[in-house]
Amino acid sequence: MRLRRLAGRRPRRRYVAFEVLSLDGPPPGKGEFEEALRGVYLKAFGAESLALARPRIVYYEEESGRGVVAVVRDYRYHILAALGLVRMAGGRRVLVVPLRTSGTVKGALRAFRSPGAPGRGGV
């Protein structure tokens, strides 16, 4: 006999591709940026929302400042707002630009390709 989960379905996740533009030198490291994002999210939406959203950085290029953050689907607009509110990370002034929201990491990573790159439809 197969056991059923009583709690319901596993929450779906969305992946938001973003780019960090640093005004003071190189972009911050992954840990510095994740700490700044969590702090802004906590201040804007509270501890309960932060716990339910479970934001985490699944991909981050420290040289370019590009990355992907995973979040529970119901909180995707919260993470977009929090990304826009991040102004300091690792002691540097930064501006975070959300590029694309996707249902898969692979789809989010496509946002980093150049517009004429293969697989993007030449758009």
Curated annotation (Swiss-Prot):
UniProt superkingdom: Archaea
Disulfide bonds: none
EC numbers: 3.1.26.5
Pfam family of the protein (one): RNase_P_Rpp14
Enzyme class: hydrolase
GO BP field: tRNA 5'-leader removal
Catalytic activity: Endonucleolytic cleavage of RNA, removing 5'-extranucleotides from tRNA precursor
Molecular function terms, GO-annotated: ribonuclease P activity
Physiological role: Part of ribonuclease P, a protein complex that generates mature tRNA molecules by cleaving their 5'-ends.
Oligomer status and interactors: Consists of a catalytic RNA component and at least 4 protein subunits.
Family, similarity comment: Belongs to the eukaryotic/archaeal RNase P protein component 2 family.
Protein name per Swiss-Prot or TrEMBL: Ribonuclease P protein component 2
Organism: Aeropyrum pernix (strain ATCC 700893 / DSM 11879 / JCM 9820 / NBRC 100138 / K1)
